[in-house]
């Protein structure tokens, strides 16, 4: 996810700080109300620190932590199992009128090979590289986001490439989107480098196993599968996606930039502009736009969050077919900026960072000059000491 913008820190230690995450999905409002723009977002990912936060009831009147009878308003808090449970509920609600896509999703979330792929991709990216979450939680969150985007596009009359090519209908589109989104990062278990191509190879047997019973016609099955594989291969813009389906997967991937994701990497030692800027993003909202079908709004608690918008999310809008369909906005929350970093001091070979929330982080200082010298010496075939 998010290309090489997710770098790692070294030797960091984090103390203190609980957090909570909220995902809310709601049905689009009927046309004619405020020019067809809904009062409530299609999907909101909201994160706040401290104790569980009371959420305001939406237009449906649902209280925090409840689900309306149609299953379209959900809110979740960490721990991880609860987050996945509620994301699953949101995805199933979005797919309830698309039987083939829903069947594919149910098969995927219970597939032992897929579960293992998510866990190992997360192990490599978080434990070995110090990156943000790329496992099961990321798959479910981005899956919910991708369906919200897809529904808004189809509601606006947009015909995706899968439909325009005559390969399939809306049910096939939702199937391709949910499978492509949830499998897009599994290649990280082999290595971050080339993870897109690795993901294609690893996804193939899973897709064939899931799609076989749903598409008895191999000719159509292979065609639908091509859109999924293309989305996996291009989700990190290397290469950039050529289809709307690929663009949806890439943009949905880019929306998972809230501090809930950044703090995980932070706690495991990745302390840099990437993880710190992620702590500055409180909320990502996906809703119907005014000038375009989709509006993605980012609410920041600190202006440092603009790095996440500029380096992670915006390129996935600009460099994909989604640039024609998505508005992107970012703003500081109404109550003003939050202090993320209050002081940095050097103690021995570590920077000690005092965070605004009272947490303390120790980061090993990298000897950049020595690393450069060693690299040059190695290239010349001599040791740094002999020169």
What do the PLM-derived regions correspond to, one by one?
Residues 116-145, 162-164, 185-188:
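Active-site flanking loop/helix segments enriched in acidic
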Residues 10-45:
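N-terminal intrinsically disordered, low-complexity tails
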Residues 2-13, 39-107, 131, 144-171, ...:
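Divalent metal-dependent phosphate-bond-processing catalytic cores, especially two-metal-ion Mg2+/Mn2+ enzymes
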Residues 142, 167-203, 227-235:
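His-Asp-centered metal-binding catalytic motifs of divalent-metal-dependent phosphohydrolases/nucleases
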Residues 112-124, 172-180:
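Active-site-adjacent bridging/hinge elements
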Residues 209-222, 239:
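Inter-helical turn/loop segments and adjacent helix faces that build the functional surface
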